[in-house]
Swiss-Prot record:
GO terms for molecular function: antiporter activity; dipeptide transmembrane transporter activity; FAD transmembrane transporter activity; FMN transmembrane transporter activity; xenobiotic transmembrane transporter activity. A transporter able to export peptides and flavins. When overexpressed allows cells deleted for multiple peptidases (pepA, pepB, pepD and pepN) to grow in the presence of dipeptides Ala-Gln or Gly-Tyr which otherwise inhibit growth. Cells overexpressing this protein have decreased intracellular levels of Ala-Gln dipeptide, and in a system that produces the Ala-Gln dipeptide, overproduction of this protein increases its export. Pfam families: MatE (PF01554). The gene is yeeO. Coiled coil: none annotated. This is Probable FMN/FAD exporter YeeO. Keywords: Cell inner membrane, Cell membrane, FAD, Flavoprotein, FMN, Membrane, Peptide transport, Protein transport, Transmembrane, Transmembrane helix, Transport. CDD domains: MATE_NorM_like (cd13137). Disulfide bonds: none annotated. It is found in: Cell inner membrane. PANTHER family: FMN_FAD EXPORTER YEEO-RELATED, MULTIDRUG RESISTANCE PROTEIN NORM-RELATED. NCBIfam families: matE, PRK10189.1.
Length: 547
């Protein structure tokens, strides 16, 4: 036995037998040694053992052939040739921006989940009322976020050109205009709140409508604070400082949970305010966050964006305002129309019963958690693209957007497919109602099935907006939202009786149309139409003079 083992060792030490070519020999030698170690209980001539050994050898060889073929395919790709530069891009450009944004969004969503937990203990009607009111609040927040995006792009572009003054003016004027607009908007919505809830709630019960109206009237008071927090955070991100928004928004959401919990359920001998405490706690925490943003800008924590309180009363510069609005208005039209269409689909769901409303709300909350890395990469792509184009690096902007897109596609698909089997477990954190959990499980599995096209639908347009190509995204969103999500969702969900599954299939049809059109835009390079590439200089041949 020792002689055979030493022979095998000398054979494998030969430099000819390198990985993976040595593995079939190693497998054969191990099988032979196993025959001798058994104290001759099994003869080497035993035919079943020989057949089994040969079968395993063939399996190993076929697996090695497949792995070798895959390795050759990977080595022949463009990614493998530039893998070192992509690694540098990931760690130096993407990670410092995307990770704090991811943590900030995760904190916001997780605190939203905890807020839902706080309300869920008050009953299904309370949870459905919050869901209906928040579906309208999301329309307003989407508008603020779009102006925030315009501010982010202008700040990133201006600082790319080393123009700090323009970045400060853009931030200051965006804060002033959007705060005034938020006050006006809050007044109008508070006055017409009952009509808005009747329109949004559809066939919901009277109790659900009353709770939704109460929550809406309390949360509209926080609109000015939400506008200040969103736009100030966007300006800081455009300046490359993503840690301060993370700290402020994270602290804001933790305060929201603490304050709302105390106001809902009371403290010590005080019984609390019940359902009213949920909306009041959110409003108080948002104003604390707005004060923190204004303080950070006033003390100049980021030197590029030092804005004193007196400067908010200076005259407005309309040239910079129109530059911000040139990106913000198309993006806001896109966001408002998108969220309005989403609100309309919520109305389809509102007539399907309280269990379906609650299950749909929970499924959207879980899907938002799954999409967090993609949302962070989308925000990072906006900043990276704006910076690169600000210094005239057009080719780098194109390469980096492609890299972010594929990174998001592969990462989100893996996350969605790995978390889908645990949909029931995640739903149990929200509710113990079996009907609601059944709805959540079905919707999360559908979300995982269509996740490979999500990044093309959402990450790519975020990068396009960094190149100030916002109008194309606006028209595509209008077409896909109203032509697919609303129409297909109504046909499948209401007319054909598919229920909430049909409404979600309309959403996936919206994703598919957006993915095709945005991917075509990226491949053709038309999203860089505002940045013409310099034409290569032609070398003119000098005429030969004959003597």
């Amino acid at each position: 036995m020792l002689r055979h083992i030493l022979t095998a060792k000398n054979l494998l030490s030969n430099p000819i037998f390198k990985f993976p070519n040595c593995l079939p020999f190693l497998s054969t030698v191990c099988c032979i040694c196993r025959q001798f170690v058994g104290e001759n209980l099994c003869s080497f001539a035993d035919s079943p053992s020989l057949f089994e050994m040969w079968f395993h050898f063939l399996q190993l060889r076929s697996a090695l052939n497949i792995s070798s073929a895959l390795r050759q395919v990977v080595h022949g790709t463009r990614w493998h040739a530039k893998r070192k530069s992509y690694k540098v891009l990931f760690w130096r450009e993407i990670t410092p921006l995307a990770v704090p944004i991811f943590m900030e969004n995760a904190c916001v969503l997780l605190m939203g989940v905890l807020s839902t937990f706080l309300v869920s203990w008050l009953g299904k009607d309370a949870m459905a009322g919050v869901g209906l009111a928040d579906s309208f609040n999301m329309v307003i927040m989407a508008f603020f976020a779009a102006i925030d995006l315009g501010t982010t792009v202008v700040v990133a572009f201006s600082l790319g050109k080393r123009d700090r003054r323009r970045a400060r003016v853009a931030t200051r004027q965006s804060l002033v205009i959007m705060t005034l607009f938020a006050v006006l908007l809050a007044t109008l919505i508070h006055h017409f709140g009952e009509q808005i809830i009747d329109f949004v709630a559809g066939d919901a019960t009277t109790e659900v409508k009353a709770l939704a109206l109460t929550y809406l009237e309390l949360t509209v008071l926080s609109y000015p604070a939400a506008a200040i927090t969103l736009i100030g955070s966007g300006a800081l991100r455009g300046a490359g400082n993503t840690k301060i928004p993370l700290l402020i928004n994270g602290s804001l959401n933790i305060l929201n949970i603490i304050i709302s919990g105390i106001l809902i359920y009371g403290l010590f001998s005080w019984p609390g305010l019940g359902f009213v405490g949920a909306g009041l706690g959110l409003t108080i925490s948002r104003y604390i966050g707005a004060v923190a943003i204004l303080w950070v800008l006033a003390i100049g924590f980021n030197p590029a964006l030092r804005i004193s309180l007196k400067s908010y009363f200076k005259p407005l510069n309309f040239s910079i305002i129109w530059e911000v609005m040139g990106i913000g208005i198309p993006a806001s039209v896109e966001s408002v129309l998108f969220t309005s269409g989403r609100l309309l689909t919520q109305m389809f769901v509102a007539g399907m019963g309280t269990s379906v409303i609650a299950g749909n709300f929970i499924a959207f909350s879980i899907a938002a958690l799954i999409n967090l890395p993609g949302s962070a990469l989308g925000s990072a792509s906006t900043i990276i693209t704006g910076r690169r184009l600000g210094v005239g690096q057009i080719a780098q902007a194109e390469i980096q957007l492609r890299h972010v897109f594929w990174l998001s596609t592969l990462g989100l698909t893996a996350i969605a497919w790995l978390t889908a089997p645990f949909a029931g477990v995640m739903a149990s954190f929200y509710t113990q109602d079996p009907q609601v959990k059944h709805v959540v499980v079905i919707l999360i599995w559908l979300n995982a099935l269509f996740m490979p096209i999500w990044s093309a639908s959402w990450v790519l347009p975020a990068g396009f907006k960094g190149a100030r190509d916002a109008r194309y995204a606006m028209w595509v969103s209008m077409l896909s939202m109203w032509g697919c999500r609303v129409v297909v969702g109504y046909v499948l969900g209401i007319m054909l009786g598919w229920g909430v599954v049909g409404v979600w299939m309309g959403m996936f049809a919206d994703w598919a149309v957006r993915a095709v059109l945005f991917y075509w835009r990226m491949v053709t390079g038309r999203w860089l139409w505002k940045y013409p590439r310099p034409e290569p200089q032609k070398c003119e041949k000098k005429p030969v003079v004959s003597e």
